């Protein structure tokens, strides 16, 4: 007879402690990178989303050489965190300010807490937080750990001091086992790629070797921040409907519920939906049965005349900032970008942006350099498993004038949405959703056509210059013949006319060849004509 099975439950904190790889913490190198990434993303969400030009300082110090423990500290000038929210914000897994129907860099309420869990698994130092909300007269300090069994914060130490320096923002320091030599290139690449799409931010990065890199602000233009919007009927299921109903503060009828709690539903649309679902408009929404909720959701899915989801919940980078960032980092001969119109998948709005940079200082390689972004987050790992890479690889670049297998090109794609279909909680690759894949392809083809036009004009220009250069060698002979004809045998006039004609012809051709050194060709001409 077999022994009885023992059943138990896990808190969210315990689950991610046991499965750190699901949150992007499979090893020390990746853990160090992921910690830097999560803290920078929190800092950006605390600044640009609220109209503040970001000033972000990142420091990584080796504090225990024998155990390879690093202290990661990120300081921002954002809106700060209300002190009563700090313990849960850093010490309770799946607690977040980002569970809203608008675009955010974070999604799961996990990121920095996963770093705290990984930290606790390997060393005993608590996370250190210093924060001051805008206009606060106090700076609040905390040292926290997570009670893994209860998924609750443990406040090791707390305090506050007078805010005499007018500081607002947050400083977070986490001590974590890491592998700097292996993580170094990824961390530098992550910061560089973040800077490409946030040229309105200032970054200062000090690495464990003492190297300090400064990324200056290039513009004061900040993208329009996303706004929280009501859910779209295409994007909700039965449980979400029930949550919306339970959270109602008013005693709505079903029709009032549809009109007031959803986007894209007015009086006329509500009447049509309720008729199709066989529901009475005046019935109290809190009296809906399980079967009636199911009918309502099924009607949502079948109804084909909803307006597309509102794009107010999204914040694009914008074509100007994309090109500014590409030009600053890669110094190309050509850069172009496109921001597509809003689309939707499963009721969630999304926008695809694409950019391309070509030539100049871009290194030549067997593949283009592909920059992947989701909600303004650079995606560094798992490149080949991402839908963006798939589309780039399948695109026929020869059709757009890229004739060689040697690429001197950067391709950038940004997907923003209220719901990014990541393949895992580590947020490093985007799943192959048909509507999104199609829109990425359309964006790349559109920006590739701009590149094709540039390359076509460049080739025509080179061909024209080649022809004009060929004409230069005939200047002595042509000018001599014309001078002889015009001088009618007068040898003194022949020499004079020849110089004038050759000079005029040379100026005419060299004007077309603005890259040609005039003095060099004049020297060549004089040698040839003697």
Swiss-Prot record:
Query: What EC numbers are recorded for this enzyme?
Result: 5.6.2.2
What this protein catalyses is: ATP-dependent breakage, passage and rejoining of double-stranded DNA
Please name the InterPro entries in this protein's record.
TopoVI_B (IPR005734), TopoVI_B_transducer (IPR015320)
What the record says about temperature is: Optimum temperature is 70-80 degrees Celsius.
Its keywords, alphabetically, are: ATP-binding, DNA-binding, Isomerase, Nucleotide-binding, Topoisomerase
SMART domains this protein is in?
A: HATPase_c (SM00387)
Protein name as catalogued: Type 2 DNA topoisomerase 6 subunit B
Q: Name one GO biological process term.
A: DNA topological change
Q: Which PANTHER family match?
A: DNA TOPOISOMERASE 6 SUBUNIT B
Q: Which GO terms describe its molecular function?
A: ATP binding; DNA binding; DNA topoisomerase type II (double strand cut, ATP-hydrolyzing) activity; identical protein binding
> Top-down, what is the taxonomic lineage of the species of origin?
Archaea, Thermoproteota, Thermoprotei, Sulfolobales, Sulfolobaceae
What the protein does?
Relaxes both positive and negative supercoils and exhibits a strong decatenase and unknotting activity; it cannot introduce DNA supercoils. ATP is absolutely required for DNA cleavage; the nonhydrolyzable analog AMP-PNP generates nicked or linear products from a supercoiled dsDNA substrate. Generates staggered two-nucleotide long 5' overhangs. The enzyme is covalently attached transiently to the 5'-ends of the cleaved strands.
User: What's the subunit arrangement here?
Assistant: Homodimer. Heterotetramer of two Top6A and two Top6B chains.
Q: Indicate the family of this protein.
A: Belongs to the TOP6B family.
What do the Gene Ontology cellular component annotations say? DNA topoisomerase type II (double strand cut, ATP-hydrolyzing) complex
Q: How is its activity regulated?
A: Not inhibited by the DNA gyrase inhibitor novobiocin, instead inhibited by eukaryotic topoisomerase inhibitors such as m- and o-amsacrine, ellipticine, and the quinolone CP-115,953. Radicicol inhibits the ATPase activity.
Which residues of this UniProt protein bind ATP? 42, 76, 96-98, 107-113, 427
């Amino acid at each position: 007879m077999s022994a009885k099975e023992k059943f138990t439950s896990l808190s969210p904190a315990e689950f991610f402690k046991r499965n750190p790889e699901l949150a992007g913490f499979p090893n020390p190198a990746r853990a160090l990178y992921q910690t830097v990434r999560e803290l920078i993303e929190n800092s950006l969400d605390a600044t640009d989303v609220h109209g503040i030009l970001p000033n972000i300082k990142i420091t990584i110090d080796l504090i225990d050489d024998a155990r390879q423990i690093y202290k990661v500290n990120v300081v921002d000038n954002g809106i700060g965190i209300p002190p009563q929210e700090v313990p849960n914000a850093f010490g309770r897994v799946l607690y977040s300010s980002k569970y809203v129907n608008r675009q955010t860099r974070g999604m799961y309420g996990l990121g920095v807490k996963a770093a705290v869990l990984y930290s606790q698994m390997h060393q005993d130092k608590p996370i250190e937080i210093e924060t001051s909300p805008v206009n606060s007269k106090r700076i609040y300090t905390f040292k926290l750990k997570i009670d893994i069994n209860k998924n609750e914060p443990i406040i090791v130490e707390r305090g506050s001091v007078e805010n005499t320096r007018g500081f607002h923002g947050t400083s977070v320091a986490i001590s974590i086992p890491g592998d700097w030599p292996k993580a170094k290139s990824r961390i530098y690449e992550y910061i560089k790629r973040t800077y490409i799409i946030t040229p309105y931010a200032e970054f200062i990065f000090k690495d464990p070797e003492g190297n300090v890199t400064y990324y200056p602000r290039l513009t004061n233009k900040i993208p329009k921040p996303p706004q929280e919007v009501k859910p779209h009927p295409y994007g909700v299921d039965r449980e979400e409907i029930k949550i919306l109903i339970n959270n109602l503060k008013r005693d709505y009828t079903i029709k009032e519920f549809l009109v007031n709690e959803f986007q894209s539903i007015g009086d006329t649309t509500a009447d049509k939906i309720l008729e199709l679902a066989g529901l009475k408009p005046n019935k109290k929404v809190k009296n809906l049965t399980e079967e009636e909720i199911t009918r309502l959701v099924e009607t949502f899915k079948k109804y084909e005349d909803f307006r597309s989801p509102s794009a107010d919940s999204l914040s694009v980078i914008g074509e100007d900032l994309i090109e500014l960032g590409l030009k600053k980092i890669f110094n190309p001969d050509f850069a172009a970008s496109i921001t597509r119109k809003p689309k939707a998948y499963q009721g969630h709005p999304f926008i695809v942006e694409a950019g391309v940079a070509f030539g100049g200082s871009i290194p030549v390689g067997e593949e283009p350099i592909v920059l992947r972004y989701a909600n303004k987050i650079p995606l560094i790992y798992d490149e080949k498993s991402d839908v963006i890479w798939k589309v780039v690889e399948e695109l026929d670049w020869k059709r757009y004038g890229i004739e060689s297998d040697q690429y001197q090109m950067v391709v950038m794609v940004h997907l923003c949405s209220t719901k990014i279909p990541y393949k895992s909680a580590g947020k490093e690759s985007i799943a192959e959703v048909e509507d999104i894949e199609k829109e990425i392809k359309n964006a790349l083809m559109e920006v590739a056509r701009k590149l094709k036009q540039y390359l076509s004009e460049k080739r025509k220009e080179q061909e024209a210059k080649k022809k004009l250069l060929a004409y230069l060698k005939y200047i002595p002979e042509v000018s001599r013949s014309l001078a002889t004809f015009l001088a009618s045998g007068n040898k003194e006039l022949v020499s004079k006319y020849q110089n004038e004609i050759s000079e005029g012809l040379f100026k005419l051709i060299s004007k077309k060849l603005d890259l040609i050194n005039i003095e060099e060709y004049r020297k060549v001409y004089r040698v040839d004509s003697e």
